[in-house]
């Protein structure tokens, strides 16, 4: 007789038709809130409507319903992303010079926008080469398209249509999974299954399919393009996929098919899965064969990772067990209880994800220039500068968002009665030590980093260059950074015996790659000037962390306001009669943190922009002499505050200031307009609510006199609303000003 264990029952993980589809609610603004649904008495109503529309926590306490709304909203977000992507590809297909650029990427600039001549606007269409007049773009799309093997505008059209189909599909999915088959809470909390599917499916199979595309489509097409074959003569992607002989002509080992794979004779594939390092001298990008190898390796790692967690079969890791076992001799209960936090608080979950994604985005910024992945990206200086700046800003915003949601978690989801002596509780109990030490570090870094500059400015003003900190007087060499550079430069043939070149030319070793007479990349020297500005980076980052971390650790209570948790995430002050308690809410810490994030990222992108123009980017003569854009002035000029103002901001702003009447004039107008937006923010940040209320009341009086007073009573912005409008315009104005300054400069000289 055979005894069988009972079959595990299949869990029903969705509710059918939970909420009927109706457009009636769309006609009722604020249907999610009793107060807002009543309609406006005062103008504050419209602000509250916007503040709470997406705050699902405030609509209901039911975690399952909140989860479904978030899940459905994600499909809406994906739909918008597909729509945007489709628009990018459509512009490439309809308005761009992509095919011309593909035939001569060193002399023709990428353009995918032509301005209609209405009243003189055609001035914006500059000559980008090859007889095409349009706006030079710096998004890097052309380079990505070439790397992926797109050779015609028809292919871009097809991809654009495909993205539209996916956008529609995502909208449908968002509706379907909220109204027709909505997942139960248990489904959202099944972390092992989620990990397996995301790791093996998204990252594993995603990387594998990309590696497959690169091997079967990108590599052969790029091989032909690099050899100078006319794009129209190159076989189409499906021909390479269906006809193995075509590929075998380029890579002979293809003739053997999968035999080497199954006989473990993998070295046969070394023709198209390489480990070379360095850059392809033809395109100035990473070797595409290295990139294909990389994606294959990543795919294998994540396919393994996606089979590690325990689901229906009772084998593998359980996240709860891992977290509860994770405790050391000095950490009390360790991560006990963290599993419950992360499966019931989506704010805690989001906070971790934002912190990691933000850090990763900044890592991407640094790799895009030091290991340029796409062909002809490294010599397109405008695109290089744009990609670095863009990824730095995005990373900064995501990290501030991490602190914001950590604080919301503390206020809304943290239950102090169930937490004792785990890591989070221990951190909260010695938060005073953490914050006061961090504060000391900030003061130390601030005085010392800035003090080095002030010393140099003073010595410079007094005519004592021999007493300055510089590479030619008192040297402060970044010896640790130089040691790391050197280690990596020496790695090929030593610690990395298989590689023919180091991972990045920036490490050193004397190699230089130039494409079409322009420098793609060369070893980046680090000296006293970099040492000084790196300490400014350390200072601004630590202050940002101080503000954000204080906001999180004191989100629920402080000596000043012991019952802060009852006041919520954002509140102006602790009520009347308690002076000196304004601007202490967790929201206010996020508000203040944003300004320091802006400071931190600004210094980083200024450093990058000047350093690259001074020491990397430039032209190379037939004799091999490199002439940099600003002639290597970074090392001696950036060591004083005056140098930054005079030789960077002022000297390099000449292009944007003098852009009027040229094809760059739009940048001049943006430069002016964005300064205005920035200045407009100060009106909200520097004046109080009462000032505006008084002004409004006299304006209302005038309207009453003329019998044109509105039914909705005008109100001044609340304190929090005013600060929100202020910081938004401050950041928007500042970022757009920087954008116009950078692009006018680099398009003119690059």
UniProtKB/Swiss-Prot annotation:
Cofactor note: P700 is a chlorophyll a/chlorophyll a' dimer, A0 is one or more chlorophyll a, A1 is one or both phylloquinones and FX is a shared 4Fe-4S iron-sulfur center.
Taxonomic superkingdom: Eukaryota
Pfam family, one: PsaA_PsaB
EC number(s) stated in the UniProt entry for this protein: 1.97.1.12
Chief localisation class: plastid
Binding site for phylloquinone: 692
Keyword field contains Ion transport: no
Gene Ontology terms for molecular function: 4 iron, 4 sulfur cluster binding; chlorophyll binding; electron transfer activity; magnesium ion binding; oxidoreductase activity
Quaternary structure and partners: The PsaA/B heterodimer binds the P700 chlorophyll special pair and subsequent electron acceptors. PSI consists of a core antenna complex that captures photons, and an electron transfer chain that converts photonic excitation into a charge separation. The eukaryotic PSI reaction center is composed of at least 11 subunits.
Protein name: Photosystem I P700 chlorophyll a apoprotein A1
Species of provenance: Eucalyptus globulus subsp. globulus (Tasmanian blue gum)
